[in-house]
């Protein structure tokens, strides 16, 4: 966890903010152009603090009724090894539910975390969000 993330958590705790530190950094929405697709986005650092929220986001996306879920990691600045590993299980779970989980990363350090964990080969490479939605 970075110092910035830790300080952010402390500030939220002192202010009795009911949201977790990761609450403003992860979201999902159905695509307006491609109604069978759901876009999930993770912004900032995805470290051990946000891991449970990340798993919850992936689970919610699989149960939304969309045929395709595109996980957009272009704004993710750090991906911990456990979060990268969680993608392997999420890919299998999605497949069992009849959902295709696609990934757009864009950053070299995020790609490296995916390669180290052996997860990268499970996902086709999509250079942009649009190609992940249209293919």
Regions flagged by a language model, labelled:
Residues 45-123:
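Amphipathic alpha-helical interaction surfaces in cytosolic regulatory modules
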Residues 4-5, 14-56, 75:
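STAS-typified acidic loop motif
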Residues 122-128, 132:
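Short acidic-hydrophobic, aromatic-tinged amphipathic segments that line or gate anion-handling sites
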Residues 11-12, 131:
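A short, charged, Gly/Pro-tolerant segment at domain boundaries
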Residues 61, 132-135:
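C-terminal alpha-helix
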């Amino acid at each position: 966890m970075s110092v910035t993330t830790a300080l952010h958590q402390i500030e939220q705790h002192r202010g009795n903010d009911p949201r977790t530190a990761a609450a403003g950094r992860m979201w999902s929405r159905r695509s307006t152009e491609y109604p069978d697709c759901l876009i999930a986005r993770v912004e900032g650092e995805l470290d051990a603090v946000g891991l449970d929220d990340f798993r919850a986001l992936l689970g919610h996306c699989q149960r939304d009724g969309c045929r395709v879920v595109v996980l957009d990691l272009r704004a993710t600045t750090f991906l911990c090894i456990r979060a990268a590993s969680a993608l392997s299980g999420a890919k299998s779970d999605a497949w069992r539910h009849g959902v295709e989980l696609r990934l757009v990363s864009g950053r070299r350090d995020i790609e490296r975390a995916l390669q180290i964990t052996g997860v990268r080969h499970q996902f086709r490479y999509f250079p942009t969000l649009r190609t992940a939605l249209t293919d």
